[in-house]
Amino acid sequence: MGVFLMKAVHFGAGNIGRGFIGELLFESGFETTFIDVVQPIIDYINASHSYEMYVIDNNYEKKVIKNVKAVSSITDEPAAVEAICEADIITTSVCVDNLDKIAPTLAKGLKERLNRGGSKVNVMACENAFYATDMLKKALVENKKAPITEAELDEIGAFPNVAVDRIALCKVVDGVKIPQIQSTFELVIEKDKMVDSTAQPIKGAEYVENLGMYLERKLYVFNCGHAATAYFGYYNNRATIFDALEVPEIKADVIAVMKESAMAMTKKYPFTFEELEAYIEKIIKRISLEELHDEVVRVGRSPIRKLNAKDRLVGPALLAEQYGLDNSHLAKAIAAGYAFDCKDDEQAVEIQNYIAENGIEKAVEKYSSLTAEHALYQKVIDAYKALKA
């Protein structure tokens, strides 16, 4: 391994860890230590201090990521602590539900780093959630196994939030999951919270002051369009997102949904409609790859969460209403969400049972917090009844 490489620590050697963040760290000149709990993946990485990944939309081109090693936080925590002490950057991709599980090891490492008089380090949670680094910091303070105070954390670390976006799948080869990723991605970092706000340690990332607008753009445009495709596709008996977007009417409806959302975003934030249109075009291209085999029931799953007033469909529809803009296609997508009756989805079953007992009006009130005083309320109900007619 190169002697002069900067050192990175990354928690989580899954699809996003190896296929996204790990690749960027390698391209940025870091030697990366992955901290994980899955022994076969740890052994696989350590066998050659490298790993393979494939780029889906480039004829599955193979890439080999080098200068890597892996340690188990279960069987070799001292090595994990040592790596944290020496790291020039620390990142995670373990899923937000697991941040409290990695907190003790990370807290122990940061505390030891502080005791040794180490330099301040950027710690970033690259998770698919709003303000995940804030959640990680909270988990560090609240963990009981390796106590560390917020003041100590601020002395030894900087905690910028990030927005992540990349489609990362995998295939199993000899019992190990090998990442298969799309070439396009977004990694947006809150620069004013970094140790040095002028530094750009990760190549290919964007460094911005107002992260909130980028997080909301992802939820209200990308996730919005993805969910709309799933619900329209399911209603029309299409198996995958690719199949759904092959139907011209569905594709037109999905683009109309995203444009309504985008128009509302231009009123709230300094985005131009043209740049959001380009973003929509990029998204449609990304999600309509046949090779993804992305099932509509997967993308549409957990409709209680997705039909919440602050989430991907009702959120932008209410924003459009607030600015007096058209949201009729968004209302139709919300209605399709209420018609999503997948038997294998607990939340879908709950919604369907509730509609059967109480009617769509009460369901929209309960799950989307919409009432008759919202113009959107009646639009959703009318659209739902039209779907059911």
Identify the residue ranges that each predicted region occupies.
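Substrate/ligand-engaging "lid" and interaction regions
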Residues: M6-F11, N15-A389
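Short, Lys/Arg-enriched N-terminal segments with co-localized hydrophobic residues
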Residues: M1-L5
